[in-house]
């Protein structure tokens, strides 16, 4: 049971959990009430850094959600890498209670990664997409070589973006690649030709919720747990 608990916590959370448990021990040595407060913080850290197994659909045609959260907006915008090209932007807001592990939205190859410095205003605001610190991935899909752009965006509280993907890496749908600590936003930019299957206000689950299809939806899906 302990192994399963540790296995289902993202490694980025280990140091926070160890420090909070140490603080709990010291807190109980000082007073019971202080120890209880510190222990509650430890449990919150475990909850925040949880990394549950997901049932991921299979297929090069699929684009799944890169993050847990709420879809704030779906709209046509200029591509962030080519202002002459129109794309569909799906914005996902992660509150502090969501799972914050990010997953690859489409099977393909990482064409580039880019760190973009910026501010730390609330990630629920539209202007955070342009002003806040973010990490950008550009993925070339296996199917028809479409470019899918993904921005991990820091928020008011989230000030640490972790991205383990690298240029030239072959990635699979639903594969874990990073995490954003303590509330954030993820924007995904898709070709206009994609068939969107979600709506504004919908709650999505990383690796499981299908955001769109590169071509028409298949009649049957297969899944795997990762």
UniProtKB/Swiss-Prot annotation:
What does the record give as the active site? 184 (schiff-base intermediate with substrate)
One Pfam family recorded for the sequence: PS_Dcarbxylase
**A GO BP annotation:** phosphatidylethanolamine biosynthetic process
Give the keywords, sorted: Cell membrane, Decarboxylase, Lipid biosynthesis, Lipid metabolism, Lyase, Membrane, Phospholipid biosynthesis, Phospholipid metabolism, Pyruvate, Zymogen
Give the cofactor note text.
Binds 1 pyruvoyl group covalently per subunit.
Q: Would the keyword Lipid metabolism turn up in this protein's UniProt record?
A: yes
**What membrane topology is given?**
Peripheral membrane protein
Q: GO MF terms on file?
A: phosphatidylserine decarboxylase activity
Mod. after translation? Is synthesized initially as an inactive proenzyme. Formation of the active enzyme involves a self-maturation process in which the active site pyruvoyl group is generated from an internal serine residue via an autocatalytic post-translational modification. Two non-identical subunits are generated from the proenzyme in this reaction, and the pyruvate is formed at the N-terminus of the alpha chain, which is derived from the carboxyl end of the proenzyme.
Pathway involvement of the protein, from the record: Phospholipid metabolism; phosphatidylethanolamine biosynthesis; phosphatidylethanolamine from CDP-diacylglycerol: step 2/2
> Where is this chain primarily localised?
membrane
Reactions accelerated catalytically: a 1,2-diacyl-sn-glycero-3-phospho-L-serine + H(+) = a 1,2-diacyl-sn-glycero-3-phosphoethanolamine + CO2
EC assignment:
4.1.1.65
Q: Which InterPro entries match?
A: PS_Dcarbxylase, PSD-A
Q: Where in the cell is it found?
A: Cell membrane
Entry superkingdom: Bacteria
Name any GO cellular component annotation: plasma membrane
Q: Which residues carry this modification: Pyruvic acid (Ser)?
A: 184
Per its UniProt record, the required cofactor names are: pyruvate
Q: List the disulfide bonds.
A: none
Q: Where is this site: Cleavage (non-hydrolytic)?
A: 183-184
The UniProt entry, under NCBIfam families, shows: PRK05305.1-2, PRK05305.2-4, PRK05305.2-5
The subunit field of the Swiss-Prot or TrEMBL record says: Heterodimer of a large membrane-associated beta subunit and a small pyruvoyl-containing alpha subunit.
So what does this one do?
Answer: Catalyzes the formation of phosphatidylethanolamine (PtdEtn) from phosphatidylserine (PtdSer).
| Record-stated family | Belongs to the phosphatidylserine decarboxylase family. PSD-A subfamily.
Protein name according to UniProt: Phosphatidylserine decarboxylase proenzyme
Q: Which organism is it from?
A: Ehrlichia canis (strain Jake)
Q: Report which gene this protein is encoded by.
A: psd
């Amino acid at each position: 049971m302990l192994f399963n608990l540790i296995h289902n916590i993202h490694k980025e959370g280990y140091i926070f959990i160890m420090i909070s448990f140490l603080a709990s021990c010291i807190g109980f040595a000082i007073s019971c009430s202080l120890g209880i407060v510190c222990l509650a913080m430890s449990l919150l850290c475990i909850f925040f850094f949880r990394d549950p197994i997901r049932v991921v659909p299979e297929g090069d045609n699929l684009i799944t959600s890169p993050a847990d959260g709420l879809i704030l907006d779906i709209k046509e915008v200029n591509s962030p890498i080519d202002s002459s090209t129109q794309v569909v932007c799906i914005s996902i807001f992660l509150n502090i209670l969501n799972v914050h592990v990010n997953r690859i939205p489409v099977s393909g190859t990482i064409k580039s990664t880019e760190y973009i410095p910026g501010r730390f205003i609330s990630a629920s605001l539209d202007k955070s997409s342009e002003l806040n610190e973010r990490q950008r991935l550009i993925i070339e899909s296996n199917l028809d070589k479409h470019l899918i752009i993904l921005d991990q965006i820091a928020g008011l509280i989230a000030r640490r973006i972790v991205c383990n993907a690298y240029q030239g890496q072959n990635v699979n749908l639903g594969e874990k690649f990073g995490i954003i600590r303590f509330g954030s936003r993820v924007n995904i930019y898709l070709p206009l030709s994609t068939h969107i299957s979600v709506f504004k206000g919908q709650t999505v689950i990383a690796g499981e919720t299908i955001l769109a299809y590169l071509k028409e939806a298949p009649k049957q899906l297969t899944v795997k747990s990762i």
